[in-house]
């Protein structure tokens, strides 16, 4: 039997043995996701509006997060906030993203409003925020909300960015 045929036979036998034993690939690993209840804090003291410091009210809410992961750092799920919104959550390369629309976010001089899109981007860090730590229950990043260019008759988008922190509480 040629050498490559013997190797192919060994690989095929191993595959059949796995199939016969009922072994299956695990698509979700609970340690890869972020599941549970978290305190979400957006620090308005360090907010920027269109790249200039512009103090905003800080916001604190409670999130319930449910995720499933196909690979480490590749996850999807849902976030439910006690501020009465639910949005998808996903991660790419250990960075998490949550995006949700906000109705009537930009007030216009004529009394009308325009919507905004709020995006949270964060990753697991040491509690002091100095180093990445995938096993940490403290996640830090940014909370960015953008209003559409052209809203209120102005051709410049409204952009507010502030530091963000997510801490597991349950």
Predicted regions and their residues:
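Flexible, membrane-facing loop/turn or short amphipathic-helix motifs
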Residues: 45-54, 106-113, 147-157
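Residues that flank catalytic or metal-binding motifs in active/ligand-binding sites
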Residues: 34, 61, 160-162
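Edge beta-strand at a domain terminus
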Residues: 140-170
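Secretory targeting and sorting signals
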Residues: 1-27
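Tryptophan-anchored aromatic micro-motifs
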Residues: 29-53, 79, 139-143, 166-168
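Predominantly extracellular/secreted and cell-surface proteins with exposed
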Residues: 56-126
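Internal, hydrophobic beta-strand segments that form the core of beta-sheet-rich folds
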Residues: 116-150
């Amino acid at each position: 039997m040629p050498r490559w045929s013997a190797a192919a036979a060994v690989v095929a036998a191993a595959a059949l043995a796995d199939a016969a034993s009922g072994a299956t690939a695990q698509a979700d690993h609970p340690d890869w996701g972020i599941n549970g209840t978290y305190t979400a804090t957006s620090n308005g003291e360090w907010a920027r509006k269109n790249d200039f410091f512009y103090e905003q009210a800080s916001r604190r809410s409670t999130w319930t997060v449910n995720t499933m992961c196909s690979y480490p750092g590749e996850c999807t799920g849902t976030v439910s906030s006690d501020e009465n919104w639910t949005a998808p959550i996903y991660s790419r390369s250990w960075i998490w993203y949550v995006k949700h629309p906000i109705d009537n976010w930009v007030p216009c001089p004529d009394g009308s409003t325009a919507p905004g899109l709020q995006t949270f981007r964060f990753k697991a860090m040491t509690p002091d925020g100095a180093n990445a730590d995938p096993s940490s229950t403290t996640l830090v990043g940014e909370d960015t909300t953008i209003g559409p260019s052209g809203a209120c008759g102005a051709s410049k988008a409204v952009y507010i960015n502030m530091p963000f922190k997510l801490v597991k509480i349950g």
